[in-house]
């Protein structure tokens, strides 16, 4: 019985023979009886191990090479906005604002609003950089005085005339219709003016936002949509709401880059019918479900260049936020307002991402002029939905 031998060079186990079958090294064993031996094979060249890539050196196993500047994220990767403010810090600002507003008989209100907006934006971060607010209290004060003079005085005079001519029903009714018509025009004017001002005073990486829509176009859209919503007993509302949102988004810019919106009101019509049918049976709770769905739809159809927004908010989360804020305000007799405001901002950002590639390096600043008159009107009619 013969035993196998191991080649001293390549380590191959084989039957005894004069040389290794693999590398041809002499084994010193007896020759095999079968056939002539094969010629010795040349030794295999020794290949050096591959050199590591530059991005693999001096890094931990989980290291990912940096994304090239400009795109900063690839398809499927979401960019998140973060808010680092706290209710306690905002409470300190809020208390001082309240005290100075009372002492100055309301004049400090404009400085108070600027301080809150500066705090909220400076604590909001995107891609490692904070936002900034550049509005001033002087602008807000002058805008308020201008709005009060141009629009407030005529409305006040109409109200006085209604009181004086109350005994003449026809004249009183006509004055009432005139007042309503003026307000219906001023509300969209205020919305556009406020958005134009606020975006023009907001920047990120020293590039400002802007709004370039014409007030007259939005007034036509708003008045027509309001009338059709009333005539159709509310059935036109999702179409009107979507067109209004489209106008405000599609005319907004970040530097020279335009935002886009491609949503359609018909996509929300079915959900709105559900709200109308179940609003009373659910004691209005179905409205939270609709608002969450609308937010997801609106954000999902909003894009900036090649990147698209994505929201994961749900009706349950929105309901819990509202109930929590209501309890907080009632339990603290209103002193918990700063914490409620911080909760709202964090909630708005927590479920929102910007997905897809975006070449931020190609965005350039484009100056746009804006006044605070519309901002003041938005305050009159409570038409603005800003955070401060």
Where are these regions (language model features)?
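Hydrophobic alpha-helical transmembrane segments of multi-pass integral membrane proteins
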Residues: 100, 140-159, 179-190, 224-232
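Hydrophobic, aromatic-rich membrane-embedded alpha-helical segments
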Residues: 94-115, 222-242, 273-291, 326-343
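Membrane-helix interface segments in multi-pass membrane proteins
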Residues: 154-183, 291, 340-368, 374, ...
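Juxtamembrane/interfacial segments around transmembrane helices
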Residues: 144-153, 226-233, 272-280, 319-331, ...
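Low-complexity, intrinsically disordered extramembrane tails and loops of integral membrane proteins
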Residues: 1-83, 354-388
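Short, amphipathic alpha-helical segments
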Residues: 168-176, 184-188, 192, 213, ...
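Membrane-interface extramembranous regions at the lipid-water interface
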Residues: 53-96, 111-146, 193-224, 240-273, ...
């Amino acid at each position: 019985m013969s035993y196998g031998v191991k080649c001293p060079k390549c380590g191959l186990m084989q039957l005894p023979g004069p040389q290794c079958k693999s590398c041809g090294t002499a084994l010193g064993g007896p020759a095999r009886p079968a056939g002539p031996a094969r010629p010795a094979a040349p030794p295999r060249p020794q290949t050096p191990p591959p050199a590591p890539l530059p991005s693999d050196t001096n890094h931990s196993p989980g290291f990912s090479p940096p994304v090239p500047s400009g795109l900063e994220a690839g398809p499927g990767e979401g960019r998140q906005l973060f808010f680092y403010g706290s209710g306690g810090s905002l409470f300190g600002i809020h208390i001082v604002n309240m005290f100075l507003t009372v002492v100055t008989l309301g004049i400090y209100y404009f400085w108070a609003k600027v301080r809150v907006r500066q705090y909220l934006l400076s604590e909001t971060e995107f891609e490692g950089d904070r936002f900034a607010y550049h509005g001033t209290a002087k602008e807000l004060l002058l805008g308020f005085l201008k709005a009060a003079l141009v629009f407030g005085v005529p409305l006040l005079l109409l109200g006085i005339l209604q009181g004086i001519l109350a005994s003449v029903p026809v004249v009183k009714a006509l004055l009432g219709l005139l007042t309503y018509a003026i307000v219906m025009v001023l509300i969209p004017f205020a919305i556009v003016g406020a958005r134009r001002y606020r975006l023009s005073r907001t920047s990120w990486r020293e590039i400002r936002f802007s709004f370039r829509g014409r007030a007259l176009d939005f007034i036509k859209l708003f008045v027509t949509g309001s009338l059709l919503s009333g005539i159709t007993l509310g059935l036109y509302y999702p179409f009107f709401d979507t067109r209004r949102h489209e106008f405000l988004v599609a005319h907004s810019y970040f530097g020279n880059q335009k935002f886009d919106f491609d949503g359609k009101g018909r996509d929300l019509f079915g959900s709105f019918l559900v709200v109308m049918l179940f609003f009373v049976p659910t004691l209005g709770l179905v409205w939270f479900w609709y608002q969450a769905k609308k937010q997801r739809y609106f954000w999902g159809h909003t894009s900036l260049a090649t990147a698209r927004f994505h929201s994961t908010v749900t009706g349950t989360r929105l309901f819990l936020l509202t109930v929590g804020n209501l309890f907080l305000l009632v339990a603290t007799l209103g002193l918990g307002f700063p914490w409620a405001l911080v909760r709202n901002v964090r909630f708005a950002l927590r479920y929102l991402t910007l997905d897809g590639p975006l070449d931020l390096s190609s965005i350039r600043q484009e100056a746009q002029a804006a006044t605070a008159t519309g901002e003041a009107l938005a305050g009159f009619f409570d038409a603005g939905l800003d955070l401060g």
